[in-house]
Amino acid sequence: MKERRGFTLIELLVVIAIIAVLIALLLPAVQSAREAARRMQCTNNLKQLALALHNYISATNAAPPGVVNTTTYPGTAPPGSLATWTAWSAQSLLLPYVEQGPLYNAANFKWNCCYTPLTGNNQTNTTVYNTRIASFLCPSDGLAGQQNINSYQGCIGDSTIQYPTGGTTTGIFQVYDPTTVSCQSVTLASLTDGTSNTIAFGEGLVGDYSKNSNYRGNGMSTPSDPSGGIVPTTMPGNNAESNPAAVIQALQGCNAFWQTSATRTCSGYTACCLAGVKQYDGQLWALGERGYTLFNTVVPPNSKQYQWRNCRLSIGGNCPSCAPEGSSFVNAGSFHPGGANFAFADGSVRFIKDSVNMLTYESLGTRGSGEVISSDSY
């Protein structure tokens, strides 16, 4: 009688073990290859934005402003300073230069851009601002598949004031109070630090609407009332690089408040929620506002020490130096390991490590502070 051929149990287990080992060895390599492809796509997206910026400058002789406001509001006008939360973004003006001419033509720039619970009842441009633009999305961000998301933000330098005097920030994109200052923009000639040493756009993580303080794409607003939490007593102003002591003191206050913000319960855009976790950064590419389409170069990308996206400090209370409408740290960040991609004013895209020195990073964001930066410093 012939013996039947087959696998013994031991042989089967050995084969399974070998397959498991191979998978364990190959999976990280596959994941690394996928991330490399996503990072390359992200680099290409930023390259498109940098080229769009140059084409816009060629056509208009100046960079687009970071805030493009109108005082016309269909329906109910936003109350008081909330009118400034309806401004168009620089990205909106760059639409024709990123192959989005039809969308640009569909936008009614005579009306404010967006509807949010803060800004009243404007539905004029709903279709426009809800459109998903693939070149504005980093594929490594898990929220990039949603509509109207924005992963790439314009640089306002190391300015932390909401509306600097005269509307002038230290970066390429200008942020102004439309109730007091006319539209501001800068020319390439004003980039005296050199276009290769000046950041134009950087990556920013998108908030997840979870009020989760453990997610570094979320941020916070601190209350002006000292009883509401630990908040800084000063802010570095329009040039953080010149006041490092104020920067550290303010960042420590933000960190302290971040530890308590998760306990705050609120919903919607209420006063309570504005003094708690902010989870809507990057949610509208059309809105010209810090956190949505603008960032500053104070906290290095993907900081392990300051693990939040945004810290907005309200005026008054124990922060008398905070500017009207607040002052902010708005951090760049990504899901790429080790740092984030940045587009420079010369059209190049470079990867800045999360270990970059804070002063070096601040210098890269400013357009005319006179620093000398070597390429091996970041």
Language model regions located:
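N-terminal single-pass transmembrane signal-anchor helix
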Residues: K2-R38, C42, Q48
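Internal low-complexity, small-residue/proline-rich segments
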Residues: S32-Y378
